[in-house]
Amino acid sequence: PPSSGGGMPVYNAQTETEMYSDEMLELARVVQSRVLEILNITGAPSNKISAEGMRPKVEDALDQALREIRHRIPGSIQIEKFRAVLMDDLIGLGPLSPLLRAADISEIMINGPDNIFVESNGIQYRTGVRFNGEAHLQSIIQRIVEPLGRHIDAASPMVDARLDDGSRVNAVIPPLSLDGSLVTIRKFAAKKLTDEDLIRFGSLSRPMAEFLKE
């Protein structure tokens, strides 16, 4: 992704939706299943492979799996970008990872696996990223809350927690949510907004800023 003036990653609003097309999501499932097979791990990606110490083994297995299915990857898809998406799924937080890394995003709102919105510079917009179905979304929710010592399931379908960086997470899953899981992540601001920032975003007029200083 591009970088802000401070060297922090900034989310690119022009995310290629082709990377998250039905075809590519299905291909991602195939690759991930093959990675787990190579690593001799049963079940969905979990803390078994998300630990940082597993990263080199996961990368090697992923590279092998990508070589095996390279002929199925459309020519318009950048292999390195697809690889990064898969690594985020395997040891990160899936499609949320680039959004969480982006310095210009203050809030992430998820309304089911296909609807991910963000707030950036005071403006809300829909992203082009998607989860690989409701089960994928719920697995990422579990990956978020489990390290915090929290639990979410059908018997306890709502969780409110704070991440290590101060960001707030609220998640609701079925049956409490009727049309897929709902997640809101309010990111902790690494940089305090100045009056000039608020004026630039349109949240504050210059006369009002001058008045508040008096």
Which residues make up each language-model segment?
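P-loop NTP-binding catalytic core
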Residues: A102, I110, N115-E214
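N-terminal anchoring/assembly modules that precede and organize ATP-driven motor systems
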Residues: P1-Y125
